[in-house]
């Protein structure tokens, strides 16, 4: 980055050393002074500004004892913290733009632990320190800085959740070798800062030296810093076995040409079929896939040259508000979770009404062996309807989701229950009681299992025949607000308020991937149909695409579309995905374009620069007039369905 851009990102300091003399005057002035701490710091600053790195390091090493003895000018410890933090900020300001960006990772944890140390014994001094230096903390940590501002004394300190997290865990940063050399040179002058780094911060060596500031900043934002390289040790079976349906979709997409997305190689990353116990594929599901197979020839391939067609469904006269929605896989039904604790089910086609199973007395009279058209006799055709309302929850319904075979609906609400509804009897079948609110519940692609994201900082895996979770994943540090099941049913992804995206193995219960880079709470997460990529969305509108194979950030789309309810859905061929931020617009992105760019840059490289606001990645933006888009869904022919509540 050039010097002009570098200066635009500088970290200011309240005690900047301003030199108005020329070089010769500086030398004469310094040589005429006794070699005390102040003179040594002036000389070191002069050497740094003139690029004399080796001389600076040599002088710092030789003058270490003097600097350590007089490191804080003999000030009391509570005042020395301010002096040392200001010195650290000034040192970062004198560095190059990339090194300065790496140093900025250290500012928040040093600031936080300095403030925590002061507030316990010197509350008044702590407030002065906080108000003076809070403006130097990167914007991505502003929410955490606000949480620290709520601490007024030792009592509120002990009750603060963020303080417990920072004290019990080390903050992780990743620095390149040049930055580590700068850090070694400054630590001899700021002993208090050095002690904080040694006790509360873990520093890893960066594999590659970043070439620009943006690359470093895209990975910042987590409450405990970036993710560790040691998390890559877990092997992940992220691929999806390609059956006849998937092969036909791929053939339709490529028009007979060879697809270059490592298709053959990815087959080696498929899990064993018996790795987890899955229910057998029912005849109903087989029939659904045969129907889908017949639609493959009519499936549209979406691109920038061939834009998507969107059908928007809007609900009106709903003053209570709609909190959630979901479509069946065949797009025949839509379920709406309302804020008044009820669920409304509508048939998308008025001619295809919902049939209700007859009562038990009538069913007992049917002779299965001799009766004709048993299926038609089991259902009350005259009582079929296009709309059904379910009641039973005691709070807003935050999530609804259909099972793959369309026989069950799962819902979660503010009453701390997850309910399983039978589509055939149109009644509540099971109630799962949870210790906290469940923000989202999601079936796996084979049914039977489902996952939940909860306000008690956990994600969980359940089965429809058990009343208690089979797995509980308790490593997040904040509410898990969104969740998704991997297409091969072996993994669960969750996004939480601590700004990390995590992937758990449902077989072993271990966390196999963790990603950092979001700057706010994560409100939506989605696996790609191929199983290799994850798309996540946060509350301030940032969109991130992660590669599970290399555990890396592939691309980031920085927007200003803040929202609290996000929706992500992939096209049936997996080449495009649609995103809504809970506002009145729909964004379309091309995953194929992104993959092509990564392939051109060298797919086998374990390190690539994340693509930020990549040209050609966003292939369309579609706005509604006043309707907030709550849910999105691609039909089997790649028609995009949107759902929203007018005026919400």
UniProtKB/Swiss-Prot annotation:
It comes from the Eukaryota. The TFIID basal transcription factor complex plays a major role in the initiation of RNA polymerase II (Pol II)-dependent transcription. TFIID recognizes and binds promoters via its subunit tbp-1, a TATA-box-binding protein, and promotes assembly of the pre-initiation complex (PIC). The TFIID complex consists of tbp-1 and TBP-associated factors (TAFs), including taf-5. Essential for early embryonic development, but not required for transcription of some genes; probably acts via activating transcription initiation by RNA Pol II, as part of the TFIID complex. Coiled coil: none annotated. Keywords: Nucleus, Repeat, Transcription, Transcription regulation, WD repeat. Disruption phenotype: RNAi-mediated knockdown causes arrested development at 90-100 cells and inhibits differentiation. The two E cell daughters (E2 cells), which form the endoderm, divide abnormally early. Phosphorylation of the RNA Pol II large subunit C-terminal domain (CTD) is reduced significantly in embryos. Reduces expression of a range of genes, including let-858, rps-5, hsp16.2, and pes-10, but has little or no effect on expression of cki-2 and sur-5. Has little or no effect on levels of the TFIID subunits taf-10 and taf-4. One of its GO terms (cellular component) is transcription factor TFIID complex. It is found in: Nucleus. Residues 1-13 have a biased composition (Low complexity). This is Transcription initiation factor TFIID subunit 5. Gene3D superfamilies: TFIID subunit TAF5, NTD2 domain, YVTN repeat-like/Quinoprotein amine dehydrogenase. PANTHER family: CANNONBALL-RELATED (PTHR19879:SF1), TRANSCRIPTION INITIATION FACTOR TFIID (PTHR19879). Residues 35-67 form the LisH domain. WD repeats lie at residues 317-358, 392-431, 433-472, 475-514, 517-556, 560-599. It comes from Caenorhabditis elegans. It holds the Pfam family TFIID_NTD2. Belongs to the WD repeat TAF5 family. Residues 1-21 are annotated as: Disordered.
């Amino acid at each position: 980055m050039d010097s002009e851009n570098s200066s635009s990102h500088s970290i200011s300091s309240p005690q900047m050393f301003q030199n108005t003399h020329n070089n010769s005057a500086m030398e004469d002035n310094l040589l005429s002074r006794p070699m005390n701490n102040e003179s040594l710091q002036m000389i070191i600053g002069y050497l740094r500004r003139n690029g004399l790195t080796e001389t600076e390091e040599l002088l710092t090493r030789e003058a270490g004892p003097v600097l350590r003895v007089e490191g804080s000018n003999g000030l009391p410890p509570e005042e020395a913290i301010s002096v040392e933090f200001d010195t650290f900020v000034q040192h970062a300001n004198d560095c190059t733009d990339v090194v300065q960006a790496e140093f900025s990772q250290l500012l928040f944890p040093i600031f936080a632990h300095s403030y925590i140390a002061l507030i316990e014994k010197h509350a008044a001094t702590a407030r002065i320190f906080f108000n003076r230096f809070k403006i130097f903390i990167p914007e991505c940590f502003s929410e955490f800085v606000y949480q620290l501002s709520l601490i007024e004394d030792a009592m509120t300190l002990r009750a603060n959740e963020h303080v417990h997290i920072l004290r019990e865990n080390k903050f992780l940063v990743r620095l390149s070798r040049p930055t580590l050399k700068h850090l070694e040179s400054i630590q001899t002058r700021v002993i208090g800062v050095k002690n904080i780094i040694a006790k509360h911060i873990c520093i890893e060596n960066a594999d590659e030296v970043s070439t620009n500031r943006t690359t470093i900043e895209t990975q910042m934002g987590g409450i405990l810093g970036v993710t560790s390289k040691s998390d890559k040790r877990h092997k992940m079976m992220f691929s999806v076995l390609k059956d006849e349906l998937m092969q036909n979709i791929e053939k339709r997409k490529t028009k007979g040409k060879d697809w270059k997305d490592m298709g053959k190689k990815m087959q080696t990353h498929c899990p064993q079929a018996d790795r987890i116990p899955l229910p057998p594929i029912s005849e109903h599901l087989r029939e659904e896939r045969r129907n889908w197979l017949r639609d493959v020839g009519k499936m549209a391939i979406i691109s920038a040259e061939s834009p998507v067609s969107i059908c928007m469904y809007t609900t009106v006269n709903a003053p209570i508000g709609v909190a959630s929605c979901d479509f069946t896989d065949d797009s025949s039904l839509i379920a709406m979770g309302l804020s008044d604790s009820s669920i409304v089910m509508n048939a998308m086609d008025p001619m295809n009404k919902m049939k209700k199973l007859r009562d038990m007395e009538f069913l007992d009279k049917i002779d299965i062996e001799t009766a004709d058209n048993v299926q038609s006799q089991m259902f009350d055709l005259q009582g079929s309807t296009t709309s059904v309302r379910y009641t039973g929850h005691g709070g807003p319904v935050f999530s609804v989701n259909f099972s793959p075979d369309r026989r069950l609906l799962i819902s979660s609400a503010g009453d701390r229950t997850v309910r399983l509804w039978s589509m055939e009897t149109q009644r509540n079948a099971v109630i799962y009681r949870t210790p906290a609110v469940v923000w989202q519940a999601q079936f796996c692609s084979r049914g039977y299992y489902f996952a939940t994201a909860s306000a008690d900082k956990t994600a969980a895996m359940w089965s429809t025949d058990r009343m208690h979770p089979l797995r509980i994943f308790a490593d997040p540090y904040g509410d898990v607000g969104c969740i998704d099941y991997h297409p091969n049913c072996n993994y669960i992804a969750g996004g939480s308020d601590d700004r990390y995206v995590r992937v758990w193995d449902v077989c072993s219960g271990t966390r196999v991937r963790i990603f950092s880079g979001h700057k706010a709470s994560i409100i939506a997460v989605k696996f790609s149909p191929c199983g290799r990529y994850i798309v996540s969305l946060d509350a301030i509108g940032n969109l991130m695409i992660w590669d599970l194979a290399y555990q890396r950030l592939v691309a980031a789309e920085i927007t200003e579309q803040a929202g609290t309810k996000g929706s992500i859905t992939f096209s049936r061929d997996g080449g495009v995905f649609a995103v809504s931020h809970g506002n009145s617009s729909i964004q379309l992105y091309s995953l194929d374009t992104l993959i092509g760019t990564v392939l051109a840059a060298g797919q086998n490289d374990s390190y690539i620069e994340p693509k930020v606001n990549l040209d050609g990645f966003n292939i369309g933006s579609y706005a509604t007039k006043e309707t907030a888009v709550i849910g999105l869904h691609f039909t089997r022919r790649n028609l995009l369905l949107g759902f929203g509540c007018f005026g919400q």
